[in-house]
Amino acid sequence: MILLIDNYDSFTWNLYQYFCELGAEVLVRRNDELTLADIISLAPAKIVISPGPCTPDESGISLAAIRHFSGQTPILGVCLGHQAIAQVFGAAIVRAAKVMHGKTSPVSHTGQGVFLGLNNPLTVTRYHSLLIDPRTLPECFEVTARSEEGEIMGIRHRVFDLEGVQFHPESILSEQGHQLLANFLNR
């Protein structure tokens, strides 16, 4: 079972739908309606941290879940979830030079992890005003995708099964979103 932590974002249900279409059993819980003990009892096979309208500091149980389950359970962070992963490991989250809300842009990627077998560059949909400050991303992460402007669009932990994407693979305008999520499911 995938635990999908909902950070009060409507895109959470698009993620839910995509994962269900891929054959996954998905349990959705809001970030303030479960504790770390609840998650431990649920024993999810994978965890997805959803997008959200806030900063990682306001993402409820998300930060604690990332801290606790990193290295034990595969975790994918989407948008806010991506930022939360980076912040847990010490990166700073900063305002983007250009706000991207509902805009598509190409990202170039390494072809690893969730990007395995995807078009390169890949057209994705972005909804964010915050980004990972690249100067603060710890060495334990590799950057797996960047925008044309060089902004971090994907990260992957070098040891743990822990990955994040700044964009929304679950948006209808994102290219190969199902395949990206299938890559997370099928490893």
Swiss-Prot record:
The UniProt record lists the keyword Amino-acid biosynthesis: no
Boundaries of every Glutamine amidotransferase type-1 domain copy: 1-187
Domain of life the protein comes from: Bacteria
EC numbers for this chain: 2.6.1.85
Record field: catalytic activity: chorismate + L-glutamine = 4-amino-4-deoxychorismate + L-glutamate
One GO location term (cellular component): cytosol
Entry keywords, A to Z: Folate biosynthesis, Glutamine amidotransferase, Transferase
BP GO annotations: folic acid biosynthetic process; L-tryptophan biosynthetic process; tetrahydrofolate biosynthetic process
Annotated disulfide bonds: none
Molecular function GO terms recorded: 4-amino-4-deoxychorismate synthase activity; anthranilate synthase activity
Pathway the protein takes part in: Cofactor biosynthesis; tetrahydrofolate biosynthesis; 4-aminobenzoate from chorismate: step 1/2
InterPro entries hit by this protein: Anth_synth/Amidotransfase (IPR050472), Class_I_gatase-like (IPR029062), GATASE (IPR017926), TrpG/PapA_dom (IPR006221)
Residues forming the catalytic site: 79, 168, 170
Gene3D superfamilies registered for this protein in UniProt: 3.40.50.880
SUPFAM superfamilies: Class I glutamine amidotransferase-like
Pfam families: GATase
Role description: Part of a heterodimeric complex that catalyzes the two-step biosynthesis of 4-amino-4-deoxychorismate (ADC), a precursor of p-aminobenzoate (PABA) and tetrahydrofolate. In the first step, a glutamine amidotransferase (PabA) generates ammonia as a substrate that, along with chorismate, is used in the second step, catalyzed by aminodeoxychorismate synthase (PabB) to produce ADC. PabA converts glutamine into glutamate only in the presence of stoichiometric amounts of PabB.
Subunit structure: Monomer. Heterodimer consisting of two non-identical subunits: a glutamine amidotransferase subunit (PabA) and a aminodeoxychorismate synthase subunit (PabB).
PANTHER family: MULTIFUNCTIONAL TRYPTOPHAN BIOSYNTHESIS PROTEIN (PTHR43418:SF4), MULTIFUNCTIONAL TRYPTOPHAN BIOSYNTHESIS PROTEIN-RELATED (PTHR43418)
Protein's name in the database: Aminodeoxychorismate synthase component 2
Gene: pabA
